[in-house]
């Protein structure tokens, strides 16, 4: 089960992902921050090269996830990159149309906090966070990926909110799979025939 934690800069995504990891959940840390810290590709110097490198690494990281039943939390998903292309009014690379959206079970859009914390990696402002959040939500919902908004509250409360929604979603998946199996057996003469 792959779950995206998304949202604009300085909304608390990394804190949430770190708390989830501390609880024993498998996580994929934000690729963009890693790329910026390396210093070779910087978004304020060449947004296209930066986004291309982030997407390449993101897809590699996601391809290495072999866990399908237990939740794996991603600090941003592949479609986050598309949102930045859209925001910057750059041509969206065709590779985004080849990414299977069904690999994501849920996306949590982390809403802004009452403060904004800029640093050497985060050079944007609160207006940017608000605008990119709208585009991020659209990039996921346009692919029928369920997006759940996580309101501003203490980080531990946000984690509880996310985990509660994940449990509810997991229960729904089990019921859906069981219902599909029952329907298949009822409709298929081969499935109901004794062997």
What would you call each of these model-derived segments?
Residues 13:
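Conserved lysine of the Walker
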Residues 16:
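Hydrophobic positions on the alpha1 helix immediately C-terminal to the Walker A/P-loop
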Residues 8:
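P-loop (Walker A) phosphate-binding loop of NTP-binding proteins
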Residues 19-60:
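Conserved substrate/cofactor phosphate-moiety recognition/catalytic segment
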Residues 89-159, 170, 174, 178-180:
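A glycine- and Lys/Arg-enriched "phosphate-lid" helix/loop adjacent to the NTP-binding pocket
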Residues 5:
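Hydrophobic anchor at the beta1->P-loop junction of P-loop NTPases
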């Amino acid at each position: 089960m792959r779950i995206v934690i998304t949202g604009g800069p300085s909304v608390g995504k990394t804190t949430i992902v770190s708390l989830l990891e501390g609880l024993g959940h498998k996580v994929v840390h934000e690729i963009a921050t890693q790329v910026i810290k390396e210093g070779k590709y910087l978004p304020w110097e060449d947004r296209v090269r930066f986004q291309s490198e982030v997407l390449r690494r993101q897809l590699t990281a996601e391809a290495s996830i072999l866990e399908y039943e237990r939740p794996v939390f991603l600090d941003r998903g592949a479609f986050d990159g598309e949102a930045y292309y859209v925001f910057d009014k750059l041509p969206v690379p065709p590779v985004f149309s080849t990414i299977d959206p069904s690999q994501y079970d849920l996306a949590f859009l982390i809403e802004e906090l009452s403060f904004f914390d800029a640093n050497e990696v985060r050079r944007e402002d609160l207006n940017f966070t608000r605008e990119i959040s709208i585009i991020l939500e659209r990039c996921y919902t346009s692919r029928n990926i369920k997006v759940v908004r996580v309101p501003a509250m203490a980080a531990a409360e946000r984690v509880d909110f996310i985990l509660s929604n994940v449990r509810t979603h997991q229960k729904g998946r089990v019921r859906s799979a069981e219902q599909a199996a029952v329907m298949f057996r009822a409709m298929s003469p081969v499935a109901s025939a004794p062997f």
